[in-house]
Each structure stands twice: as C-alpha cells, then as structure tokens.
Design a protein with these regions (language model features):
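Residue register of alpha-helical TPR repeats
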Residues: 16-18, 57, 61, 101-102, ...
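Amphipathic alpha-helical segments of tetratricopeptide repeats
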Residues: 44-51, 84-91, 124-135
Length: 139
C-alpha cells in the first residue's frame, strides 16, 4: 500500500509538471486542462519537490506563472505578496535568475494594477540582472 501511494504521488507530480510546462514556456496561465486556481494549488504542492531536486529555474518559472494566474483572477494583493515572497526567497538563495523572474512578477503585478511606472522600474532591474549575468557568463 505504501509503495503504491508513493508511486501515485510521484506520478501525479510528473503529470502536473507535464501539464504546467507548456504554460510556463508560453508564459500564460490559460489552459483548457488546468484552471488558474489549480496552478496556484499545484505550485504549493510541487515547490518542496522542486526545491529538493534543486530545479530552481523551473521553480521560479512556476512561481511567476502563479503570479500571472493570481493577476488573471484579479487577486492583485495576493499576486504582489507572492511576487515579494518570491523575491525574498531568490535573494536569500543569491539566485539571480530567481531575482530577475521575481522582479518580472512584481512588474506584471504593478502593470496590471495600473501603476506602469513602478512596473517599468521592476522590469529594468530584472533586465539589468540578466544582462550582468550574461556578461559574466561570456567572460
């Protein structure tokens, strides 16, 4: 019984990820197979596994998708809270891609809550981080 439960849990995580990956790739929280509410729930379920496996890029992309889903539902305060916690986590990890994705999430939230100047600042900061990383990689 324990083995089948473990296998089921692993299978459902893989199934969830396979459904979420196209949404992440195209940066859209819309799908006929997944509701925006499911994206939010699945992010919470998948986070520990992705952290354990050190799939940080996928984890932060999933968090960005979750923020987009919250924005789509009109939950701006939840979206900004999620984006800010995402930013704090990336900073604690010193993970520049996570920081840049967090700033994109913050910018998306500002843009959709009619504060475009704050959004632009977040986007600029994200681009600066990515540019700096690219320059260091190419040296």
């Amino acid at each position: 019984m324990l083995i089948s439960v473990t296998l089921y849990a692993a299978h459902t995580s893989q199934a969830r990820l396979s459904l979420l990956k196209p949404l992440i790739k195209y940066n859209t929280p819309f799908s006929t197979e997944i509701s925006t509410d499911s994206i939010t729930v699945w992010e919470k379920l998948l986070e520990p596994e992705l952290e354990e496996q050190q799939h940080y890029s996928l984890l932060f992309q999933l968090k960005l998708l979750t923020v987009r889903a919250l924005i789509t539902e009109g939950h701006f305060s939840l979206a900004i809270d999620k984006a800010n916690s995402m930013y704090q986590k990336a900073k604690e990890m010193s993970y520049s891609l996570g920081t840049a994705l967090s700033l994109q999430a913050i910018g998306n939230t500002y843009l959709n809550s009619s504060t475009p100047l704050a959004a632009i600042e977040s986007y600029k900061e994200a681009l600066e981080i990515i540019s700096k990383d690219l320059m260091q990689t190419n040296m």
